[in-house]
Amino acid sequence: MPVRRIGIGVAADGARVQESARKAGIDSRVIFYAKPGLLDAGQDFGIEEGDEPWKMLVGDLYAGKIDAAVRGTLPSGATLRVLREAAGVDHLERAALLEDGKGRRFLLAPVGIDEGWTVVDRVAIARRTKDLAGILGLEGGVAILSGGRLSDAGRHPRVDESLAQAELVARLTGFPHFEILIEDAAEECSVIIAPDGISGNLVFRTLALLGCGQGHGAPVLNIDRIFIDTSRASPSYANAIRL
């Protein structure tokens, strides 16, 4: 299905969001969802205003008025809560499309701090992220990470637990366990599954916000609409709009 209309949320720094839409350079029409008086969209873009723009953005996505949505600078808690309710799911699973300093692109999951805390969660996330990689044309396998090398067993109970869980995820999915060696995983794979959501979030922030890499947004995996989550700390949302 062609994506003709893309909505993006604006709660702060409207100029940055507008500039991102201009830099995206896409044929799709971009529509801003913001509180009244926050910005002037001009002739190039549409604008929908309301006191709760996150509800409008998600509502229009599920009503078919827009074909895809980007969170932009809308608050995470309120926006994702409304999205969960509209999608009829009790949790969301996200995978971030990242690019390192060498220009290599890969998907990283889980990246939400409340995601990926059980073996069942990570098995589901790994399989869905692999499917997304295929849609995006990313070649390479799936790497399961843990909190140490197998030879580190016995050094700390949490390390032991992380190793055991990663081994189980690897066995259930058939994907290789790369232990803690994320550098090797990035060389060989297009999908990296972190030990938990906090680890994944830290990897994302280190690469995209401190290092030489960049983020392209984080599609939500377990809903039937296109919704790209973003970090409010991102310098631009052009990549997420293109995605």
Predicted segments, located by residue:
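Anion-binding alpha/beta catalytic cores of soluble intermediary-metabolism enzymes, centered on
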Residues: 1-185, 189-190, 199-243
